[in-house]
A protein has these predicted regions:
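Conserved acetyl-CoA-binding loop-helix of GNAT-fold acetyltransferases
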Residues: 83-93, 217, 221-223, 227-243, ...
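Recognition helices and adjacent regulatory flanks at domain boundaries
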Residues: 193-196, 206-209, 228-241, 248, ...
Length: 282
């Protein structure tokens, strides 16, 4: 008998999605970081996104070897898949008459998905962001002195943390989307702040560790406070704190932003891969 075809299992429950992808998260924690942390957030706070969906790609033996996620209004996220597998899901969703704002993830797979999607569903695909993936293999070191000191955010900091996280997302995506708060991350001690002269001047947070890997994100210094190295200080200190807890660190950066890329590489992060975000339009 010929082998069974590659199949896609739709999952709409976050806890079930966690179970489906547990093996992949353990074996490919960096690639699955976004999917794993977002899925965790939906287990903790089910209303965080409306209508989330996951697809587990299974090979002929039934093993889950590919992972996809869609949390509207975000583009569909390809966590792990070959270009051929990505094209396969695009064909399935196009045939079902699905509607997607875009796709993001591994460069080759996202490009393959977009090509298949537009050929079947119509419209155009435009690259909106190119992203580098970085990991940390040494203890971070700031190559210059930064005024001030690091501390872990507490509950009283939550309003400021949420305000700055909104500003961080607005700077990347443009205004218009209200982002979920970081109250749980604050409660879990995963938000770092930098204070200087009695004033909080910068922040970053670490995702829950999945497969032993945490993702540093939300790095934000208000524009009027930049130029003092605060972002370097908070990222280095937060990364070191997570390393001390036995977690490996990674992060993503916009490749069009040479400043942030230079900052992270100076701290010891190294570029290990690329992702891409593509927007669909009619």
């Amino acid at each position: 008998m010929p082998p069974a075809p590659f199949t896609f299992e739709l999952v709409t429950d976050a806890a079930q999605a966690q179970a489906r992808f547990a093996g992949l998260v353990a074996s490919e924690p960096e690639a699955l970081s976004v999917l794993a942390s977002v899925t965790w957030s939906l287990v903790v706070e089910p209303g965080r996104y409306v209508g989330p969906r996951w697809w587990a790609g299974r090979d002929a033996s039934g093993e889950v070897v590919a992972a996809f996620m869609h949390t509207p209004p975000h583009p569909l996220h390809i966590a792990l898949a070959t270009p051929e597998q990505a094209r396969g899901l695009a064909a399935v969703l196009a045939e079902l008459g699905d509607r997607l704002p875009g796709v993001g993830g591994l460069r080759a797979s996202a490009e393959a998905f977009a090509q298949e999607w537009t050929s079947l569903a119509g419209g155009t695909a435009t690259v909106s962001m190119e992203v580098g993936r970085f990991d940390l293999t040494t203890r971070p070191r700031v190559p210059f002195e930064v005024p001030g000191a690091f501390r872990v955010a507490t509950g009283v900091d939550t309003p400021l943390v949420d305000e700055w996280n909104q500003q961080f997302v607005d700077a990347i995506e443009g205004p218009g989307r209200t982002v979920p708060g970081l109250e749980q991350q604050v409660a879990d001690g995963r938000v770092g702040l930098w204070d200087d002269d009695g004033r909080t001047v910068s922040m970053a947070y670490a995702s829950p560790a999945n497969g032993g890997v945490t993702r540093i994100s939300g790095v934000w210094t208000p524009p009027e406070l930049r130029g003092h190295g605060y972002a370097s200080g908070v990222v280095a200190a937060l990364s070191a704190a997570r390393l001390d807890q036995g977690e490996a660190c990674m992060l993503y950066t916009d490749l069009a932003n040479p400043t942030s890329n230079a900052i992270y590489q100076a701290l010891g992060y190294r570029r290990v891969g690329d992702s891409i975000s593509i927007t669909f339009s009619a």
